[in-house]
Amino acid sequence: EKPISRNIFFHESKKDLSNISSNDVFGLDGLLSKSFESYELRSNQVEFSEYVEEIMCNEGGIGVVEAGTGLGKSMAYLFGSIKYSHSHSTDNPVILSCYTKHLQDQLFTNDLPTLSKAIDAPIKAVLIKGRNNYLCKTRFNWLVNSSEKILSGDEAMNLLPVLVWLEHTTTGDLDECPGFTNGFTYRLIGLIHSEQGFCTSSMCAKNDGCFFGPLRKIAYQASLIVVNHALLISDAQSKINGGESLGFLPESNAVIIDEAHNLPKAAYHQLTITFENKSVNYILDRIDPRHSHSVRWNSSLRSIAAIHPKFEISRSALEGLVENARHTVKMFFDKMTSNSLHQFDEKSAEPIKTDLSVHCP
């Protein structure tokens, strides 16, 4: 049976790491050798770990190092990070960034427990992914309660794995539930994952709550935070834009970027904004009073209209505005497609001129 994933790792100890060197850990008869039956000394691993420790101990230090496969670099920089956080326990945490969520999970669930057991060091570590990876229990329960109005029969069936998984998960990480995420559940995921606008409000907290919020609070108490490149970039972008209460993550004292050569690629994908017909119409579905996807939204509008009758006029006008928006969006993408097909034909390519504005009475 596969164990349920964990995203919080605490190891209590009063052991002093200040006099423990990289060779004491990774040497032939070092602390780590006791964790493996056939331990092999890798001198490059010792050098790598010493280099990481040296860079981290120099304020403002920046280091770049290339390591071949099989060197054991994860363990090497983990020890440097743990030792540094131990000697700077009152400072900000160390952030470890991996290229993919798979490598992030491997570092946290395999390497970190093995090393912490070997060196018996005090550790408070948290694994955290982007907000959209986590289930919001409030949104999920509301969806289940309104499923007959909002979901098709197949969509309701696709939620069954989540209902079973929810009884066991301690993380709320939807990647733990492949029976759900491996299906064609794009719309469903959008309806149940943690959402910045809703899950940062009191409405979510007063009901069933969200997995991401409490985890984010725990991250501010951790000495090590394991993230992926996408979240690291999102956090920097959020702090620049002033969103998410000035970032997802606390200010760090040091950052280690594993597979840093993939950082530009991750930045490109993370910072790319995709504008497509399907996504625009999905948004319009959620505010269209006539569409089944807007049941909760439409119910709220009717409640307001019951108190303020004039609001009903605006609600009725919304149908026409949404229809106009759909037509305009279709014209826009049809023209974009035409221009793309004839992009090298100067006579065929024309500027797109259409009025995207709408007016509410």
What residues fall within each predicted segment?
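A substrate-engagement module of RecA-like helicase motors
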Residues: 2-35, 88-225, 229-230, 285-319, ...
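Conserved pre-motif I regulatory segment
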Residues: 15-65
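Walker A/P-loop NTP-binding motif
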Residues: 53-55, 74-89, 110-114
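Walker A/P-loop
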Residues: 58-79
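Residues immediately C-terminal
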Residues: 103, 232, 262-265
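Conserved helix/coil segment N-terminal to the catalytic DExD/H
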Residues: 213-220, 230-249
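SF2 helicase catalytic motif II
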Residues: 248-281
